[in-house]
A protein has these predicted regions:
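Short alpha-helical segments that sit at the start of domains
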Residues: 1-14, 123
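Short, cationic-aromatic polyanion-contact patches
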Residues: 3-9, 60-79
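Short, locally clustered residues in the helix-turn-helix/winged-helix DNA-binding domain
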Residues: 15-21
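Short acidic, hydrophobic short linear motifs in intrinsically disordered regions
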Residues: 22-31
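Short, hydrophobic-biased segments on the C-terminal half of alpha helices
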Residues: 43-47
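Glycine-centered, phosphate/nucleic-acid-interacting loop/turn motifs that mediate DNA/RNA or nucleotide
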Residues: 53
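Short beta-strand "wing" residues that participate in macromolecule-binding interfaces
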Residues: 57
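Amphipathic alpha-helical dimerization/coiled-coil segments
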Residues: 77-123
């Protein structure tokens, strides 16, 4: 699998596209209002993402509508692999232990994680 990496600004833009399915430059800018980005900064990020092959655009009136071409789950898998390798010395077990030791996780979420782990164990020969 090819590694996918997004610098912070590109990740913020991609998050808007994943959440909304598509967006114009203005819509991305509005969604990121807390960052107070200039229109040209958002446009530049989208153009860079398009050059990298992570988004595509279609004309919409006088503007362009941008669409993600990579799924959030695929980007997440790549990010988790980087974290596992760089922070947890390649150990998924250490990473998992860190996640489940979080005292702020609600019991319901821990139960869902347990079911996911049980299901995965049943798939493994």
């Amino acid at each position: 699998m090819t590694e996918i990496y997004f610098p912070p600004r590109e990740l913020a833009v991609m998050s808007v596209l994943w959440r909304n399915g598509s967006a114009t430059v203005s819509e991305v800018r509005d969604a990121l209002e807390e960052e107070q980005l200039a229109y040209t900064s958002v446009l530049s990020a989208l153009q860079t993402l398009e050059e990298k092959g992570y988004v595509r655009h279609e004309p919409e009136g006088r503007a362009y509508r941008y669409f993600p071409t990579v799924e959030a789950a695929r980007a997440g898998t790549s990010a988790l692999a980087r974290i596992r390798d760089s922070i947890f010395q390649g150990s998924a077990e250490r990473m998992f232990a860190q996640i489940v030791s979080d005292k702020h996780l609600p019991r319901e979420e821990l139960e869902r994680m347990r079911r996911l782990l049980t299901d995965r164990l049943e798939e493994t020969p």
